[in-house]
Amino acid sequence: PIAGSMILAAILLKLGGYGIIRLMQIFPTTKTDVFLPFIVLALWGAILANLTCLQQTDLKSLIAYSSISHMGLVVAAIIIQTPWGLSGAMALMIAHGFTSSALFCLANTTYERTHTRILILTRGLHNMMPMATTWWLMANLMNIAIPPSMNFTGELLILSTLFNWCPTTIIMLGLSMLITASYSLHMFLSTQMGPTLINNLTEPTHSREHLLMTLHLIPLLMISFKPELVT
């Protein structure tokens, strides 16, 4: 069920990150070299999850793997145990919680009308649901972490933290962000652009769906422009 996916991606997955933050308090902050294998594993896991997103044909699976890839960056930033790293991890967890939940909501909106989650079968929806296409564009831009979104702030803090710790990590981080932009663009173009493959008429988006997306993106934009609301 889509409600379970939204709660899992927005809350339960982030509780794991919060648990790691609490657990790291019992370890000395000066021995980050001890955690080198875990940091490399977290970054490598983020890249593998992003590569898995590129080969997904199921819309829901693509969004789920996207959430996992972002948590790899969060875990790497937490393990380094610096103020910037913790701030970036918290910012990215909050921002991506809203973003992934919004994407799952949009995926369900598409599924209710097409009865399929296969990307190639849901193309051309901008002809039938132009307002939903706007929501898709905003959610994907947040997923890519464009400035001045909270996603961008979190990823920038994480990037700075990992680069100061080891400049070589910029290669893995840059590759991860490049793949994230690639599959986000692929997801948007596959579901919204191109010729319509659905023969029957679909009903337009309802007010409840617009309200649901507004309740996802308005708090995210408020936090992006006024981050002291959560600090």
From Swiss-Prot:
It is an enzyme of class 7 (translocase). Its main location: mitochondrion. Pfam families: Proton_antipo_M (PF00361). GO terms for molecular function: NADH dehydrogenase (ubiquinone) activity; ubiquinone binding. The chain crosses the membrane at residues 1-21, 34-54, 63-85, 89-111, 128-148, 169-189, 211-231. It is a multi-pass membrane protein. GO terms for biological process: ATP synthesis coupled electron transport; electron transport coupled proton transport. InterPro entries: NADH_UbQ_OxRdtase, ND/Mrp_TM. It comes from the Eukaryota. Its EC number is 7.1.1.2. It catalyses: a ubiquinone + NADH + 5 H(+)(in) = a ubiquinol + NAD(+) + 4 H(+)(out). It is found in: Mitochondrion membrane. One of its GO terms (cellular component) is mitochondrial membrane. Keywords: Electron transport, Membrane, Mitochondrion, NAD, Respiratory chain, Translocase, Transmembrane, Transmembrane helix, Transport, Ubiquinone. Belongs to the complex I subunit 4 family. Core subunit of the mitochondrial membrane respiratory chain NADH dehydrogenase (Complex I) that is believed to belong to the minimal assembly required for catalysis. Complex I functions in the transfer of electrons from NADH to the respiratory chain. The immediate electron acceptor for the enzyme is believed to be ubiquinone. This is NADH-ubiquinone oxidoreductase chain 4.
